[in-house]
Amino acid sequence: PAQPAMADKADKADKPKAPRLTHPEPVHSTPDRSETLRRVDGREMRLAVGNSHFPVEQTEAWERFEEAMGRPLWGRYLYEDEGKPVAAIALYRYEMGGQTFLWAKHGPVWLKEQSPEREAHLRRLLRSVVKERDRSVRFIRMHARYRAADLRELLSTITYDRTYVIDLVPKTPEKMAAVMPKDGRRAVKRAERVAREAGCTISDETGLSREEFDKVYEVLRETAERDGFKPHDAEVYWTMLTSLGEKNARLFVLRKDGVPHAWDLILTSGKDSVAYYGASSNESRTFRGAEALDWWAACTLAQEGYRGLDLMGAGSTRVPSLYTVGQYKKRYAQHVTEVDGAWDVPVSRVIYSGMSAAKRLRDALRARRGSRED
């Protein structure tokens, strides 16, 4: 639905105003290639990307969230060929075990041909920039399509290089279901019916109070205990909602008798949406709460004009641990979508090797303690 003119003005007023670079860095290049790397501000990066797919983590809006979490913007850069943008990247300063690294989530954003040679050259230029600007940075975490000798598996967290995206272009639930696999069509219709008969309600609760959000968060504790992972503190999710704002972050909640049983935190950028976080209670399985909620979210976003809902991650030969969740997600799309996975790019190979060795030792000790407890 169309928004009031005042809302449009408010959106524009809320956009972060990145400061202009008063002392711009020199343009970085190598003698063997024509592409160059240049530091830019948020406005110039946004103009360069234009109408191309722009992951929310690379937008100016994301800077608000990272700043609120104590992870400042390290820099935005344009990779260009004869003055024409080829790729854009925003990097944030992170700390892990007392060591500093840079994280470009879902970056770089490629605007022209993404060849193995260009990927490698961009990384070479970035390493050079880091060595000049900040000797405390140990590695860069960024995405790449092609395996290469300078890439390492992640020291922490997991990535994904395959995902499923619900096609929202058909807009109506009937047409959206028609382009899904047969078992997916049956599943969403059944989930919709079972949840309705159980008396469930689903709504957009993006503007809820902190007190109410804390109650919704408790569903994630139950999910984590069931599925064996450690969730972030509630403050992380709340900060994401409030710092990104309704234009880029939404919270959809399924309730039964007023009690929250499932929720999706969905991020948006342009015409694209991503199911960033989600949770469901054990009881919700009896009335297919998570399935009903995911389908409702997809239908709602389709009506608002979004073109896809990325379910974020599916199993692959590189990340087999995502196989099970991928089996659930595959019902929503006819085909898997290949995406660039994240990699670590050592700036100092010696120090990074030491960090890797220390992690292997910690993992081995943890496994040994676990086996003794068993």
Task: Give residue spans per PLM region.
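Non-catalytic accessory segments adjacent to catalytic cores
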Residues: 116-167
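Cationic, low-complexity basic patches in intrinsically disordered or flexible, solvent-exposed regions
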Residues: 4
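Glycine-/proline-rich flexible loop or hinge segments
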Residues: 99-114
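Flexible, glycine- and charge-enriched loops at secondary-structure boundaries
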Residues: 115-119, 181, 230, 287, ...
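A conserved beta-strand-loop-helix scaffold within acyl/acetyltransferase catalytic domains
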Residues: 24, 28-82, 86-98, 144-163, ...
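Active-site/acyl-donor-binding loops of N-acyltransferases
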Residues: 7-34, 38, 145, 150-175, ...
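Hydrophobic beta-strand segments of well-ordered beta-sheets in folded domains
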Residues: 100-102, 134-142, 307-309
